[in-house]
Swiss-Prot record:
Keyword tRNA processing: no
Name used for this protein in its record: MND1-interacting protein 1
Region of interest called Disordered, as start-end residue ranges on this chain: 552-571, 602-622
UniProt keywords, alphabetically: Coiled coil, Metal-binding, Zinc, Zinc-finger
Length: 711
């Protein structure tokens, strides 16, 4: 019970809580619980639920299965079951979608063969029947486990299928139990989670028709503070929790379809001994505290087992009581003595706890504050224990009163039975109905007795819890003393820290002097760095000027190169034009020369013929003959002059157009340049290698200089 002060502030109350799952529940369970909770919230304000029209949530949680569903009409039950079936069919379609089927195919399979009958739960049966339809190719009609066949077309929508499935299950249940009405059959299906086999084994309570009697079968669930226990509204399959609760591996609560039952007589709370880090306890102190608390827990557990054995004896005695006064005395007196003994046991165990008594004196104000805080918490706990005791006593009184009423009714029924037995044998039907009513009343009496026993068990549990709370109060006092010791140790540490702080301040002053010296050095370095940067800028400016001059020189060189290339191209084009002109003139002069030679030959022939004519024709006058000869001589002179001019033109250099040609190129044998132009021409064309003839563009392999009459 080593509860610290911090835990007391965080959790000021302790309540009996239902066991939790060891792992997160599946998603389908959570959705089912949410659906049932919404249904319950709609039914809480039903007019026929109570006589006064108001609903007590504590009474609702005490018996959820019978206090809610028993008051529902047939329409409400049918609506709830149809909603449940709709949820299950939607889950089945989603599972088929997860298996890789399309939504249309999955819905068709569910509508065609998605019956909810089979050996497993409803959802698994729907999925298996739909898968069998899909595996068979989707052809033919599917049949359920009860021999009801459907065609391949199936139903038009899920609503028709849900109504058909519900009607089929009600019909089967009424075939098994013919005395069931439709409402009772739907109630059995709701309690058995739509399982026809389990529904056929359920007994319909008598308050299904009257809606006035409450059977308290889940009294242990009342400590939840007015909240609805959703697990009670679900099927029994959803009410099985796993794991243990308490000290050790066992001893945990188990849930059944009727409610909440404990394996042991009391709730064993497992709490780890937590020593807060801010207390800074020594290892020896922690180990001593843990040993003391462990010893206290073991002793308290042993004493509680003894009280449990004694309480079981008192429960057996209370079952044997028939008088209400005897039942009341049997249920209350042992509880009072048991609570006092448990409290005394807790106090004795706390007296055995020992810690170091060598604690230094601390401030009275801090101690008073802690004690006042603890006293407030103790008062709160006492108020809560008192309220729970009053509630348990009230329930015990109600149960005892109910038992007395049932006993009186049992006596009247027994007298009626004796009177009926004296009647004739022709009234056998009346006798059978009376016997049935008598057995029902006996069952109700047993239930009332068991309800009273459970109320007694709850009272003892509350008393045990009260003892635990008192033990926790003593533990809080112990933790307060521990906190005082921790404060003393903290003050010592504070003194040590102050000494360290003074040493650190001296060291800080020394470091500040060093920092100022380093700052002066950094300033000097900054000055030198500025000078270096200025020098670097000057060098960079000079380098940029040189780079600019170099770029200008390169640009000028490129410009000269381009102009030189343009001049060479122009000269080559001009040379080519001259060569073509020379060739054309040469050809023209050659043709003229041939024509003139032919004309000269013709003239010579004509002169010979003329001389013969002159001799033959002496009578012609001499004047005409002399004129003809003069014309011929003039033409010959003109031809000779033009030939001389042409020959002189062919002897000029094609480059300088002044000097006479004096160089012959081989192998083309062209003579088109003078000696000086030949040297410059060869020098400008790669130093004389691969020189082409300016006349025919042939490669010149050799040049020969010639000398004529004018050279």
């Amino acid at each position: 019970m080593g509860c610290t002060v911090r835990e007391k502030h965080v959790k000021p109350t302790r309540r009996i809580k239902a066991a939790a799952f060891r792992s997160d529940p599946p998603l389908c369970w959570v959705e089912k619980i949410a659906m049932s909770q919404s249904i319950v919230e709609n039914l809480v304000y039903h007019p026929g639920l109570t006589d006064s029209g108001s609903v007590n949530l504590n009474s609702v949680t005490e018996n959820p299965e019978e206090n809610f569903w028993a008051y529902c009409t047939e329409e409400h039950l049918e609506e709830i079951l149809l909603k449940h079936l709709e949820f299950l069919y939607n889950q089945a379609v989603s599972k088929l979608l997860e298996l890789g089927y399309e939504e249309r195919v999955a819905l068709k399979a569910v509508l065609s063969n998605g019956h909810c009958y089979g050996e497993l739960d409803v959802l698994t049966n729907i999925v298996n029947n739909s898968l069998s339809y899909l595996n068979s190719g989707g052809g033919g009609g599917g049949s359920n486990g009860n021999g009801e066949d459907r065609t391949e077309t199936g139903f038009t929508d899920l609503r028709d299928l849900e109504e058909y499935s519900l009607a089929g299950m009600i019909y089967l249940l009424q075939q098994v139990k013919p005395n069931l009405s439709k409402g009772d059959a739907m109630w059995c299906l709701l309690m058995s989670e739509l399982h026809v086999g389990r529904a056929s084994t359920l007994d319909v309570p008598t308050n299904r028709s009257s809606c006035c009697t409450k059977e308290d079968s889940n009294v242990e669930d009342v400590g939840t503070g007015g909240t609805l226990d959703i697990a009670g509204f679900m099927a029994p399959a959803l009410c099985r929790f796993h794991g243990g609760w308490g000290f050790g591996n066992g001893g945990g609560p188990e849930f059944s379809g009727n409610g909440f039952s404990m394996k042991g007589a009391e709730l064993k709370l497992q709490r780890e001994i937590d020593c807060p880090k801010r207390f800074n306890l020594s290892p020896s102190m922690k180990s001593l505290l843990k040993r003391n608390v462990a010893a206290f827990a073991a002793g308290y557990r042993a004493s509680m087992k003894q009280k449990q054995i004694q309480s079981s004896d008192t429960i057996g005695d209370s079952k044997a009581c028939n008088d209400p006064a005897i039942v009341k005395s049997c249920g209350q007196q042992p509880r009072k003595s048991g609570s006092e003994e448990s409290v005394s046991t807790v106090l004795e165990k706390f007296r055995d706890l020992n810690l170091d008594d060598n604690l230094e004196s601390v401030g009275v104000d801090d101690k008073d504050c802690v004690i006042v805080d603890l006293l407030h918490q103790v008062k709160d706990f006492e108020k809560k224990v008192k309220e729970r005791k009053e509630w348990a006593q009230k329930n015990a009184m109600q149960a005892a009163q109910k038992v007395s009423e049932e006993l009186a009714e049992l006596k009247t029924l027994s007298s009626e039975r004796e009177g009926i037995q004296l009647l004739k044998k022709g009234k056998q039907a009346v006798e059978e109905s009376t016997a049935k009513r008598f057995t029902d009343k006996e069952i109700e009496l047993r239930k009332a007795c068991s309800q009273n026993d459970r109320a007694n068990v709850i009272v003892r549990k509350l008393e045990n819890q009260n003892a635990e709370i008192r033990a926790e109060r003593e533990g809080s006092k112990l933790s307060a003393s521990e906190s005082l010791k921790a404060c003393m140790e903290a003050s010592k540490k504070e003194k040590k820290c102050l000494k360290k702080l003074v040493a650190w301040e001296k060291q800080i002053l020394k470091l500040q002097d060093e920092i100022t010296a380093e700052k002066e050095k950094i300033k000097a370095l900054y000055k030198t760095l500025a000078q270096i940067t200025e020098y670097e800028k000057e060098i960079e400016a000079k380098w940029r000027q040189e780079q600019k001059a170099k770029e200008e020189a390169l640009a000028q060189m490129e410009e000269e190169q381009r102009s030189k290339e343009a001049a060479e191209g122009h000269n080559k084009r001009k040379l080519e034009t001259l060569r073509l002109k020379i060739e054309l003139d040469f050809q023209r002069h050659k043709d003229d020369h041939q024509r003139l030679e032919q004309e000269l030959g013709r003239l010579k022939a004509s002169s010979d013929s003329d001389s013969s004519h002159i001799s033959n024709n002496a009578w012609k006058p001499k004047k005409s003959q002399g004129e003809n000869i003069a014309k011929l001589l003039e033409e010959i002179d003109k031809l000779e002059g033009s030939y001389d001019n042409e020959a002189n033109y062919d002897r000029e250099c094609i480059i300088c157009m002044k000097d006479e040609v004096s160089v012959v190129f081989l192998p083309c044998a062209h003579q088109v340049v003078c000696g000086s132009c030949s040297d410059s021409f060869f020098a400008s064309n790669n130093g004389g290698s691969k020189v082409t003839c300016p006349c025919c563009r042939g490669l010149v392999q050799q040049r020969i200089r010639i000398f004529g009459a004018t050279s």
